[in-house]
Regions:
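Transmembrane alpha-helical segments
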Residues: 76, 80, 136, 140-144, ...
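Membrane-interface helix caps and helix-loop-helix hairpins in membrane proteins
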Residues: 119-127, 265-272
Length: 301
């Protein structure tokens, strides 16, 4: 009789990850509106600043509201190494893993299209979506994670961030108005690619914040989450929970500093998903995960 594979301890779910996901879901479900209303009950400089952080900047800049989407993508990345280890322990083949990745990515893209009004048949509809970006970015990151070792994965993330910076800095939109900044909505190559290749209607007519080219650095966000999850999984026996939380907190500080310094030449911008934005939200996500992890540590399913 063929022995039944057992589930490794490393595939146990992290209560801290579930708690962080729940925290993020609060804001996805509209908790920011409640925060703003409470702030209005107590006028003042601090409450005004908190209320302002519950909305997106018009273009360049950063607020707490900008962290909700990338944190969710980062969390999806963290959980993948645990899911992958479990699938492999149950005998999944490489083909099985590919099919599961593609199915999940395709379903998220489909759900995004449905949310945008697929069944209303009101063409041209918007085809890009938050769910679609999560599906595409996560699936591409999972494919890369599946096929490369850790050092190569880190190199890929670095190449994406530096390459995206170079592309946006050096290649303006061919149809940009004279004098348009390469990081403006009118002048960026990101919007040009949307107008050229993105089916349907972009969100801003000339640009879509969940468009094609800006999904590439979102892949880096998902991969950074996967690298974090792999670090936690592989260091289970070697490091204490507090030590792992400390290392993640230090990495959070490093990423945040890199993002702030990079902002001097490559503005932090969620709609463009700039490389500086990737670094800052990676710092935020790592810091939040370290905080939740330190408080809750491991738990059995």
């Amino acid at each position: 009789m063929k022995p039944q594979p057992t589930q490794p301890a490393a595939s146990q779910r992290l209560l801290s990850l579930d708690a962080l996901r729940g925290f993020d879901m609060l804001f996805i479900m509209g908790f920011a509106t409640l925060v703003v209303n409470v702030c209005h009950l107590f006028p003042g400089d601090v409450s005004a600043a908190v209320a302002e952080s519950m909305s997106h900047p018009a273009w360049h800049g950063f607020s707490h509201h900008d962290t909700i989407f990338p944190l969710f993508l980062f969390i999806a990345g963290i959980s993948y190494p645990f899911s992958l280890a479990k699938q492999r322990s149950l005998g999944a083949t490489q083909g099985d893993l590919y099919r599961k990745i593609l199915k999940r990515g395709a379903l998220l893209i489909l759900f995004g299209l449905i949310y945008n009004g697929l069944f209303r048949l009101d063409w041209p509809m918007r085809t890009a979506s938050v769910l679609g970006r999560i599906g595409l970015a996560w699936a591409l990151a999972a494919m890369l994670f599946l096929n490369f070792r850790t050092r190569t994965r880190i190199g890929i993330v670095g190449a994406i961030l530096v390459g995206y910076w170079a592309l946006l800095a050096l290649v303006p939109a061919p149809d940009a108005p004279a004098g348009a900044d390469v990081y403006s909505m009118e002048g960026t190559i990101v919007g040009y690619i949307d107008r050229l290749l993105l089916p349907g209607r972009p969100y801003y007519k000339i640009f879509d914040p969940e468009g094609l080219l800006s999904t590439v650095p979102a892949v880096a966000t998902a991969m950074l989450g996967m690298l974090t999850g792999e670090f936690v999984r592989l260091s289970e026996q070697r490091l204490s929970g507090n030590r792992k939380a400390l290392y993640m907190a230090l990495a959070a500080v490093a990423f945040t500093l890199v993002g702030i310094l990079w902002d001097l030449s490559f503005p932090i911008n969620k709609k463009l998903w700039t490389s500086s934005f990737v670094c800052v939200v990676a710092g935020y996500s790592l810091g939040m995960f370290a905080l939740f992890y330190c408080c809750l540590l491991y738990t059995s399913p």
